[in-house]
Amino acid sequence: MNEGEVLVVGGTSDARALCRQLDAANVAYTLSVATPAGKALAGDIKGQVRCGRLEYGQMVAWLKENRTRWVIDASHPYAEMVSHNLLRACETAGVLLSRYQRPE
């Protein structure tokens, strides 16, 4: 499995915790963050980190180019447009999508 086959989206502490679980299970992945600050905070993970916002069409292209099979949406709960675009992009590309839900 290559890094692009699993995509974790989010610059939150929850996303980093999920990445550490993937590290412990020896699962290759890419963490996608929107900002350089998010990239700097991701410094302790083993996966590849991509930085920059993606619009719907860019998401579809990235998923196809990287042969992504699973996306984990761990974006901030208020990032509704990101989650909406991810849902549409995964449906278009035929990719499994899981949404991380923060415990209350």
Predicted segments, located by residue:
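Electropositive, gly/pro-rich neighborhoods at or near active sites that engage anionic ligands
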Residues: L7, Q21-A25, V33, R50-L54, ...
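Phosphate- and divalent-cation-binding pockets in alpha/beta enzyme and binding domains
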Residues: A17-L18, A40, Q58, M81-N85
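N-terminal glycine-rich anion-binding loop in soluble enzyme alpha/beta folds
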Residues: G10-K46
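Glycine-rich, highly charged phosphate/nucleotide-binding loops
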Residues: I45-K64
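Extreme N-terminal starter segment of soluble prokaryotic enzymes
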Residues: N2-V6
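Glycine/small-residue-rich loop that forms an oxyanion/phosphate-binding "nest" at active or ligand-binding sites
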Residues: V60-E104
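Small-side-chain structural scaffolding
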Residues: G11, A15, C19, G52, ...
